[in-house]
A protein has these predicted regions:
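Non-catalytic interface/linker regions that flank or bridge core catalytic/transmembrane domains
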Residues: 1-62, 69-71, 77-431
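Regulatory modules associated with amino-acid/nitrogen control
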Residues: 237, 277-327, 400, 408, ...
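Hydrophobic alpha-helical scaffolding
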Residues: 88, 139, 152-163, 184, ...
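Proline-centered turn/helix-capping motifs that create local helix->coil transitions or kinks
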Residues: 409-416, 448-455, 529
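Alpha-helical phosphate/pyrophosphate-handling elements in metalloenzyme active cores
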Residues: 39-61, 204-219, 226, 432-474, ...
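Short, conserved secondary-structure transition motifs
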Residues: 114-124, 519-528, 719
Length: 852
């Protein structure tokens, strides 16, 4: 073909593709679009094939998605060019010319050129090739060659081997996506519960059912009519969505990125409500479709399993349940049984038999159907209530039972408030799972505390949980702690009301109701205290102890808090947070067990403990008496006994040095480093230090800023490596100790800070920066709270602005939650003057302006 003809054909093809998109956008018939798009490409390729006189020389075959006539706007075109035994020079040149022309038309093609024997070898070697050819379709050329190919495909297809290979492939893909489809930007093709999981059903179906089509799933009683119709509806939903996604992205994009979610919601005519954005409502439907796909994929792959064993074990204490393939299954005689009265019996039996790893497909379908029939009569039935609580009180498979229940929509049907948060995403810059998935992750984390083989993860939590008398209380607290998300208002208070209703309905003991209610109301208190306040201050511990009241509340809240934070995102939890929570638990427990010690007594004990540590280094009290007197009494409120001992060892011979003293050490928990700064007090110490740590790639997790009675700054910084890497710590420590002295002594102004770009997530959700300033009691100290999206350079920028306003920082607690920063500072105006409201408002506006 001459260049002019190619350009004309390319223009014609582009126009036809555009018309197909226009028709789709008008009618929203994705199935027709995919077929028509495939047929358009069929005609185009056949025309090229014919013009190059390849018709009698080789066979052109469509494979994969193109083979099953599901060609999306920007999908690759998979082709097999089947040749006779070998390629001669003329045929090779023609095929090369054909592929070149296809690319010239702007089509994205993936192709292979093979003869029958080569294809047979590839089918046996690679299950991906076998799968692609399972959906092959003749386009043009030698039909005899194509018939031979179909014969080879059928001869080499061993259903059992194919099934095992595809299951392994699916498991690997799910692992790649962290076993969760409920993340913020799911891949609607590859993520668990996406189109690939629907295609898996077709591939396995084709391998074991002759002339398989989806309608046979209903005809052969693999699915009832209702589930079959929902399967078809879900398939259409995903296909329409993927077409739209390609259109707005203008490329082969299968991830529902934040940038596209609102655009898609607009195209699909979602409307915002009082408490939900249109994109959130759209994503809720996406997650519901994912949820159903995950469920139906499991059901049908179990039903279509060609290597299913006929071995059945009867269960003595149940006349309608059997064990088959290590699944708990419904006896075929009771296939049409009304299982609603026995829903919870199923899970009690599942927990009882250790060899059971899941439920059988027929039982799953029955449970899914029964979920729709749960009503108030069922919920008020004392027998059913006792069974549900029995499942939670079991020592076996609590997490697995609840996950299967949720898969079958049973939890949301039994606890309607839970049903409202199923598939609901949390757009708060740190939760990456839907609310129901997060809640189940919390329960899974609680269950991990019980396992001896996982004791190394959290030894203290393991010991506390093993000795915890009523574990079901913690599971119920986890179920309800976020149950009121998305309603507007304080979800902790609203969730507590849901607990009261559930407790009243289920006749929970008053003690259990009171503890669960308190845990739901207070589930954020411990993390807030640990991450925002100074735990070395006895007054902070005293205030927290007043809130928790007793050891039972403290232990319960500690276990729930650790499990909760770990369930938000893999990026939120770290050893720093673990240490903060552990220390708060330890200090508060000590306070509760010792009784109400006065602040003076607490400080006296702290001095005694520090002195004992120093004594092990042969440092007597007369060595550091002057140093401690110069530090003043407030110093002992600021630092722990271990920190006091360390600092005293370093400084007792340097009470008033002329040059800054910098010392660095590893943190005791093994994560991060501590940097001590001791020098004559001047302005901008904190600011210069922030800039230095930014430059060397360390983020400040916490800072204690203290001024001694003889006007020396004694500051302690806890640092985390922003980009963990292998380093020589000895060299790093020497570098910091030398370089930071120079920075602090220089009179040069620090370079203006430039914030890094916002993350896509923060940009999409337009997270509003929140800043508040409140006076601490009647003192000249003010608490500054800043909540914003986290970016490199943020702390330096805040410090720059505070320096300009003659405001000094006495304490900083830096809390990073995924992409969100929640930073708390204790600050003082110059000369400890009090700030009036105008000054406070003005400072808030200036900080917002520089952070924005």
């Amino acid at each position: 073909m001459i260049q002019k003809e190619i350009l004309s054909l390319k223009k014609e093809l582009a126009l036809n593709e555009l018309n197909l998109i226009k028709v789709f956008l008008k009618k929203r018939d994705g199935i027709s679009y995919l077929q028509n798009h495939s047929q358009l490409i069929d005609k185009t390729l056949s025309r090229l094939w014919h013009d190059l006189e390849l018709r009698n020389s080789a066979t052109l075959i469509a494979c994969g998605g193109y083979g099953r006539q599901e060609l999306f706007p920007y999908s690759d075109i998979d082709l097999l060019i089947l040749i006779p035994k070998s390629l001669n020079k003329s045929l090779s040149q023609k095929i090369e010319q054909f592929i070149s022309l296809v690319w010239d038309l702007g089509l994205r093609v993936g192709h292979s050129v093979r003869n029958i024997n080569q294809t047979k070898i590839e089918i046996k070697r690679d299950i991906t090739v076998q799968t692609n050819l399972l959906e092959s379709r003749y386009l043009n050329g030698d039909k005899v060659l194509y018939k031979n190919l179909k014969k080879i495909i059928n001869e080499t297809l061993i259903p059992a081997k194919f099934y095992q290979g595809k299951i392994k492939e699916q498991d690997h893909r799910h692992q790649k996506y962290n076993q969760s489809a409920y993340q913020l930007e799911p891949n609607i093709k590859e993520s668990p519960g996406g189109l690939r999981d629907l295609q898996m059903i077709q591939w396995v179906g084709k391998s074991c059912i002759k002339r398989f089509t989806p309608t046979k799933l209903n005809q052969k009683k693999y699915l009832d009519k209702k589930n079959y119709q929902k399967l078809i509806k879900t398939d259409i939903f995903f296909k329409n969505l993927r077409i739209l996604l390609h259109v707005i992205a203008k490329q082969n994009e299968d991830r529902l990125l934040f940038d596209y979610q609102n655009k898609l919601a607009l195209l699909l005519k979602y409307k915002k409500t009082t408490h939900s954005k249109r994109s959130e409502l759209f994503m809720k439907d996406v997650y519901e479709a994912i949820n159903f796909t995950t469920f139906i994929n499991e059901v049908l792959l179990k039903k279509l399993n060609p290597i299913e064993s006929d071995k059945i074990t009867k269960i003595t204490d149940s006349h309608f349940l059997i064990i088959k393939n290590n699944y708990l299954e419904i006896n075929s005689k009771f296939q049409n049984k009304n299982i609603k009265p026995y829903i919870f019996d199923v899970f009690m039996t599942f927990q009882k038999y250790k060899q059971l790893n899941s439920l059988g497909p027929n039982l799953l379908l029955l449970l899914g159907s029964a979920a729709n029939r749960i009503n108030d009569t069922f919920r008020k039935d004392k027998n059913q209530q006792a069974k549900f609580l029995s499942i939670l009180k079991s020592n076996e498979k609590v997490n697995r039972s609840l996950r299967i229940m949720n898969k079958c929509n049973l939890i949301g049907s039994y606890i309607p408030a839970f049903g409202k948060i199923v598939s609901q995403m949390q757009h708060d810059l740190f939760h990456i799972y839907t609310v129901d998935e997060h809640i189940l992750n919390v329960i899974q984390n609680l269950r991990r505390f019980a396992k001896d083989e996982l004791k190394h993860e959290f030894p203290d939590c393991h010991d506390l949980f093993k000795n915890y008398p009523h574990k079901h209380i913690l599971y119920l607290a986890a179920l309800f702690h976020d149950i009121a998300k998305g309603r507007g208002g304080d979800h902790s208070e609203l969730g507590a009301k849901d607990v009261h209703e559930f407790s009243k309905l289920n006749h929970l003991p008053s003690h259990d109701e009171a503890l669960i209610t308190w845990l739901v109301k207070s589930h954020l208190v411990m993390s807030h205290t640990a991450q925002k306040l100074d735990l070395s201050d006895p007054r902070v511990i005293e205030e927290f102890a007043r809130k928790v009241v007793n050891k039972e509340n403290l232990t319960s809240l500690y276990l729930l808090t650790v499990a909760d934070i770990r369930a938000t995102s893999p990026h939120v939890w770290n050893q720093w947070k673990a240490t903060l929570l552990k220390n708060l638990f330890k200090y508060t427990l000590n306070y509760l067990e010792q009784g109400n010690l006065s602040h003076e007594d607490s400080i006296a004990k702290r001095k005694e403990k520090a002195a004992l540590i120093l004594n092990t280094y042969n440092i007597r009290d007369d060595h550091y008496k002057d140093l401690w007197e110069n530090f003043g009494e407030n110093y002992f409120y600021k630092y722990t006994e271990e920190e006091i001992a360390w600092q005293t060892r370093l400084l007792f011979t340097h009470t008033a040095p002329k040059k800054p003293i910098i010392r660095v050490r590893h943190r005791s928990n093994g994560e991060g480093i501590e940097v001590l700064i001791y020098q004559k007090n001047t302005m901008h110490i904190f600011n210069k230090t922030c800039h230095f740590f930014d430059e060397i790639g360390y983020s400040i997790a916490a800072a204690k800023i203290f001024t001694t009675q003889h006007n020396y700054a004694l500051n302690l910084f806890d640092l985390l490596d922003a980009n963990p890497k292998s380093v020589s710590y000895e060299g790093l420590f020497k570098f910091i100790e030398k370089e930071l002295v120079g920075r602090l002594e220089t009179s040069k102004e620090t370079k203006p800070t430039k914030l890094s770009e916002r993350s896509r997530q923060a940009t999409h959700f337009a997270f509003d920066t929140k800043i508040s300033i409140a006076q601490v009691d009647e003192s000249p100290i003010y608490q500054l709270d800043i909540i914003t999206d986290d970016r490199n350079g943020l702390l330096s920028l805040i410090s720059d602005q505070l320096s300009k306003e003659n405001i000094s920082i006495n304490q900083a607690k830096i809390n990073t939650l995924g992409s969100r920063a929640e930073d708390t500072f204790l600050v003082a105006y110059k000369n400890n003057l009090k700030m009036n409201q105008n000054k406070i408002d003005n400072l808030v506006e200036k900080l917002k302006a520089v952070i924005a």
